[in-house]
């Protein structure tokens, strides 16, 4: 054994050839600060070996290196800029020394090689991969950019266009694509990986492969003519501006850095990467996006722990076809759980099957599946007008009309047709689960399962625990949601549960602004362009459906009369009374026409101004700051109340529900991350200016306490140790 660290070791393989093996405790390898330091020590040992002829890098895990240790990021990002820069220089010196070894090097890459894992193998001369490879640089999705030389080496290896596509979008690619663009040199079966890598290494040692020529381009300026460079970088900057926008500085910073570094050799180019990385790491956007990643891991870990003792349902059923039922049936079947889809009429069943077939055809068109797979999936969805096969199902989700009487009747009837251990769930969006449970003989086997539309796209499923829902019932429903590829978050019961309960105060803020003379077009523009929502409130209401919102608004007002009962006729009432139901009938706040692809495109409609004039004061202008404050305060206050009342268990789960269920702007990180970034005292000062607008603007006492004591909602993070300690971690 030449060297043994906590996460990697170095040993001789055969005469003159050494192997460096990543083998961290636990299931995966991460390129954390300790591993970077250990890698430097191992390379130091190699540099002393006069008889070294070649080096093989490999992993003892199912994946090569999954990336940097993101749990370290928040503390690293608190280190002063100068110290963070010093540490990056140290880390890059390690990869430079790997790249500069006076012998050929090869990485045998299996599974994931992401972020720092990808940057590590870019420093070797050759890369051989297994078919399950996923390799790439996802850093821009975390609000940063590659920091271990990825933005320097990848463009010089692949050319600017392919590298920019991966780096700016934070993409990873599979084995075939990696081979096509030159990111790996070959792909072999897993059992042949080391043997194949050794064969390449021996060819390089014997002079049959010119490893020095392979290495040289990574040390030099990027080989691009002035015209090629102008075209590549202009197109890349245009694409980034269009897709990422101003709220995500990392992608455009990465592109500009690669452009600026193109005319320099490795050392100067790495210095530019360092100078760009450090300021990004100190942005609120990076903290928010890293926070989302960590919250996502927490939520998924919680679901995994919850379901460890239950079996995933093997057969499911959906009550109520149509678009929603068809979407749920498709998602279940697509992920391998056969489903019976029941409705009371053929027309709805046809609509549900058409929806499932349409979604499968999209997968076929994209080349994700072939005709055989399509037929196989669709054959596991069984449409029926009766209860045939219900005695075999493990779980049933009801997705009929949002009416408590209808839902109770359907659930009670279904309970008599299934096994005593079958779980029943309701896809209600607002009706309290404990109220629906009153109709059942086995309420312990019942809970809520709130999907979001469109089901195949929206990652969140709210799992609602009723007063009598058993732990086993919740666990089984969470297991099914996870199997469907969704992110389940368990919440406690109340009208609207969590997501809709906090959404309707946001809509109430919108209605009050319109009542006071604001223009809905400006509100949409401000909330989209300035705050960052994917849709402004008027557009969102049109997508949800004005009729749906009108009904849900009444349910929420009955559930929370002190805050959500209104004493005036609002814009939603006016549009509902005029039969303007939004996208579903082409008329809402906006008018909708289908574009060439059959998608609804919004247009202005002067008629709506006359309708709104009946429920509004004369038009007046509002500042962007006032619009944002009046829209967000009611939502944030309600989010805080939900945490204080135990409707949602943690700030992390609340923020993920908002991001995954409502599209809360990820660069803000969710309501609690936004509050912590803004500061609770500053938020309180802002909210107090609008208390005269009513109970929705009254800040909860718990938040007032946070402001008094200057306490955040997320646990405070300590800065990482000084850079000198990091080096020898």
Curated annotation (Swiss-Prot):
Substrate binds at residues 296, 500, 660. GO terms for biological process: fatty acid beta-oxidation. Keywords: Fatty acid metabolism, Isomerase, Lipid degradation, Lipid metabolism, Lyase, Multifunctional enzyme, NAD, Oxidoreductase. Residues 1-189 are annotated as: Enoyl-CoA hydratase/isomerase. Its EC number is 4.2.1.17, 5.1.2.3, 5.3.3.8, 1.1.1.35. The active site is at residue 450. It catalyses: a (3S)-3-hydroxyacyl-CoA + NAD(+) = a 3-oxoacyl-CoA + NADH + H(+); a (3S)-3-hydroxyacyl-CoA = a (2E)-enoyl-CoA + H2O; a 4-saturated-(3S)-3-hydroxyacyl-CoA = a (3E)-enoyl-CoA + H2O; (3S)-3-hydroxybutanoyl-CoA = (3R)-3-hydroxybutanoyl-CoA. Residues 708-729 are annotated as: Disordered. PANTHER family: TRIFUNCTIONAL ENZYME SUBUNIT ALPHA, TRIFUNCTIONAL ENZYME SUBUNIT ALPHA, MITOCHONDRIAL. This is Fatty acid oxidation complex subunit alpha.
């Amino acid at each position: 054994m030449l060297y043994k660290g906590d996460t990697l070791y170095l040993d001789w393989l055969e005469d003159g050839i050494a192997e460096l093996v990543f083998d961290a405790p636990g299931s995966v390898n991460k390129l954390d600060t300790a591993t970077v330091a250990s890698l430097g020590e191992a390379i130091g040992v190699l540099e002393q070996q006069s008889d070294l002829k070649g080096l093989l890098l490999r992993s003892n895990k199912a994946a090569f290196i999954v990336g940097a240790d993101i749990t370290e990021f928040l503390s690293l990002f608190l280190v002063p800029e100068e110290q963070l820069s010093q540490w990056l220089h140290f880390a890059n010196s390690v990869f430079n020394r790997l790249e500069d070894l006076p012998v050929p090097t090869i990485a045998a890459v299996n599974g994931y090689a992401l972020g720092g894992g990808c940057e590590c193998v870019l420093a070797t001369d050759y890369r051989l991969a297994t078919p399950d490879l996923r390799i790439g640089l996802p850093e821009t999705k975390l609000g940063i950019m590659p920091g271990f030389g990825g933005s320097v080496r990848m463009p010089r290896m692949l050319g600017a266009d392919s590298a920019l596509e991966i780096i700016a979008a934070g993409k990873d690619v599979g084995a075939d694509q990696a081979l096509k663009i030159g990111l790996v040199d070959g792909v072999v079966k897993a059992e042949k990986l080391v043997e194949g890598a050794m064969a390449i290494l021996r060819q390089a040692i014997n002079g049959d492969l010119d490893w020095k020529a392979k290495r040289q381009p990574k040390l030099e300026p990027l080989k691009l003519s002035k015209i090629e460079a102008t075209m590549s970088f202009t197109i890349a900057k245009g694409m980034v501006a269009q897709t990422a926008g101003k709220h995500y500085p990392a992608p455009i910073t990465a592109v500009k850095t690669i452009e600026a570094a193109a005319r320099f050799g490795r050392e100067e180019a790495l210095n530019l990467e360092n100078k760009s990385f450090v300021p990004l790491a100190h942005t609120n956007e990076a903290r928010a996006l890293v926070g989302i990643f960590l919250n996502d891991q927490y939520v998924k870990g919680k679901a995994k722990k919850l379901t460890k003792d239950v079996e995933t349902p093997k057969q499911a059923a959906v009550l109520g076809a149509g678009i929603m039922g068809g979407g749920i049936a498709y998602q279940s079947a697509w992920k391998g759980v056969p489903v019976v889809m029941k409705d009371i009429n053929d027309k709805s069943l046809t609509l549900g099957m058409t929806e499932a077939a349409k979604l499968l055809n999209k997968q076929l068109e994209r080349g994700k599946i072939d005709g055989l797979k399509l037929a196989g999936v669709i054959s596991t969805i069984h449409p029926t007008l009766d209860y045939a096969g219900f005695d075999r199902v493990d779980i049933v989700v009801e997705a009929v009309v949002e009416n408590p009487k209808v839902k109770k009747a359907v659930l009670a009837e279904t309970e008599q047709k299934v096994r005593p251990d079958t779980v029943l769930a309701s896809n209600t969006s607002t009706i309290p689960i404990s109220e629906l449970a009153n109709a059942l003989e086995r309420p312990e086997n019942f809970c809520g399962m709130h999907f979001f539309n469109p089901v195949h796209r929206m990652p969140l499923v709210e799992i609602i625990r009723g007063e009598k829902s058993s732990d086993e019932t919740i666990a089984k429903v969470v297991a099914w949601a996870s199997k469907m590829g969704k992110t389940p978050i368990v919440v406690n019961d109340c009208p609207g549960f969590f997501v809709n309960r906090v959404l309707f105060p946001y809509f109430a803020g919108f209605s009050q602004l319109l009542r006071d003379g604001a223009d809905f077009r400006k509100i949409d523009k401000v909330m989209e362009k300035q705050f960052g929502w994917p849709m402004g409130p008027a557009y969102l209401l049109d997508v949800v459906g004005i009729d749906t919102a009108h009904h849900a608004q009444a349910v929420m007002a009955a559930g929370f009369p002190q805050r959500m009962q209104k004493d005036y006729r609002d814009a939603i009432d006016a549009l509902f009374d005029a039969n303007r139901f939004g996208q579903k009938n082409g008329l809402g706040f906006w008018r909708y026409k289908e574009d060439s692809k059959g998608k609804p495109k919004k247009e202005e409609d002067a008629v709506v101004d006359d309708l709104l004039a009946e429920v509004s004061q004369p038009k007046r202008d509002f500042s962007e700051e006032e619009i944002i404050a009046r829209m967000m305060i009611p939502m944030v206050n309600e989010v805080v109340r939900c945490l204080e009342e135990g409707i949602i268990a943690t700030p992390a789960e609340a923020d993920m529900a908002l991001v995954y269920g409502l599209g809360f702007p990820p660069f803000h990180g969710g309501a609690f991350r936004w509050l912590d970034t803004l500061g609770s005292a500053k938020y309180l000062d802002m909210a107090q200016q609008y208390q005269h607008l009513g109970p929705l603007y009254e800040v909860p006492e718990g938040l007032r306490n946070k402001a008094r004591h200057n306490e955040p909602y997320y646990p405070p993070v300590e800065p990482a140790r000084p850079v000198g300690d990091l080096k020898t971690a």
